[in-house]
Curated annotation (Swiss-Prot):
NCBIfam families: nuoB_fam, PRK06411.1. This is NADH-quinone oxidoreductase subunit B. SUPFAM superfamilies: HydA/Nqo6-like. HAMAP family: NDH1_NuoB. NDH-1 is composed of 14 different subunits. Subunits NuoB, C, D, E, F, and G constitute the peripheral sector of the complex. Its cofactor is [4Fe-4S] cluster. The keyword ATP-binding does not apply. [4Fe-4S] cluster binds at residues 42-43, 107, 136. One of its GO terms (biological process) is electron transport coupled proton transport. PANTHER family: NADH DEHYDROGENASE (PTHR11995), NADH DEHYDROGENASE [UBIQUINONE] IRON-SULFUR PROTEIN 7, MITOCHONDRIAL (PTHR11995:SF14). GO terms for molecular function: 4 iron, 4 sulfur cluster binding; iron ion binding; NADH dehydrogenase (ubiquinone) activity; NADH:ubiquinone reductase (non-electrogenic) activity; quinone binding.
Length: 169
């Protein structure tokens, strides 16, 4: 009699069941991005326009929330001063895991034209940023595209990073 060997793992070594759960969790996380907005300057107007009926972020599953405790996405737009840095960090720390950040506009990305002692030269000096949107001010379509790119990034991530594949032999 021939013995059949059954391989219950996929290419990355995780069991098939965990890989399926991984895909399901990533799909659900990517299609329900609830963002807390932190608009500080002109880019906030474009961010508000993106949430309006003309651009309709709801069809991507993205809703703007007022509380960071209900959000998994933070969108920062405008010039961040050193006084604001503490509040940005506090809002980021209040968000539940997993969390993502979009930096919108030249001022949030690099400090923009405000190279002064009171300006933070890029929000990535305070919190980790996943996607940078260039421009002054970026169009609402750019923010929509950034959310779509973030959704693709989330789908590729490992939903359960703390699980390590076990060797059976």
């Amino acid at each position: 009699m021939a013995e059949h060997q059954v391989n219950y793992t996929q290419n990355n070594g995780l069991p098939i069941v965990l890989s399926s759960v991984d895909k399901l969790l990533n799909w659900s996380r990517s299609n329900s991005l609830w963002g807390v907005t932190y608009g500080l300057a002109c880019c906030a107007i474009e961010m508000m326009a993106t949430g309006g009926s003309r651009f309709d972020l709801d069809r991507f599953g993205s809703i703007f929330r007022a509380s960071p405790r209900q959000s998994d996405l933070m969108i920062i737009s405008g010039t961040v001063t050193k006084k604001h840095a503490e509040f940005v960090r506090r809002l980021y720390d209040q968000m539940p895991e997993p969390k993502w950040v979009i930096s919108m506009g030249s001022c949030a990305n690099t400090g923009g034209m405000f190279n002064t002692y009171a300006t933070v030269q890029g929000v990535d000096r305070i919190i980790p940023v996943d996607i940078y949107l260039p421009g002054c001010a970026p169009r609402p379509e750019t923010l929509q595209y950034a959310i779509m790119v973030l959704q693709q990034k989330i789908r590729r991530q490992k939903a359960l990073p703390h699980l390590k594949p076990k060797r059976l032999i």
